[in-house]
Curated annotation (Swiss-Prot):
HAMAP family according to UniProt: UPF0305
Pfam families on file: DUF2115
InterPro entries: DUF2115
Annotated protein name in UniProt: UPF0305 protein MmarC6_0221
Protein family according to the UniProt entry: Belongs to the UPF0305 family.
Phylogenetic classification of the source organism: Archaea, Methanobacteriati, Methanobacteriota, Methanomada group, Methanococci
Transmembrane portions of the chain: none
Amino acid sequence: MKSRNFFSKLKEESYDVGIFDLMNAKVYLEKDLTYLPEDYKKGYLEDFFTFFPEVLREIKNKTEEEIEDFEINEEEIKKVDSRICSMGSIGASRDSYEKLVKTVINYLIFINKRPLHALTTRFPGGKQIIEKNGNYYCPIKNAQSNELSICEFCICKDLNEL
């Protein structure tokens, strides 16, 4: 699939994510993060619900002509979507969360090629993603690499490579 065609699809999907979806996604994620330490959970939610709506706006404001046109492996898109569908728990607000995450994550991975977390996100141990010389380094890249995560699709390298 051509990147511009995929971007057009994502742009259409971005208009399907409304304020109620954002509210439902927040309710869902708050429940899903119940057992995390409160200070970590609070920061993660703030970063997530600042970053993801910003990326949605970015998608809505970009034109197809601004996107470099290249081939995207459709199997990779299906693999990412499948992983997103398998993440987290089942809940009433899951559909809203999934709609938001699929649109934003696919854009970040395949079109914009940026980290999947905001650069301000604090991970356990207080570490953050670092940008250096146009490369991104993540403190949890290798720790989270498994068949259920989407880390393998992220542009970040492991922090230990820095």
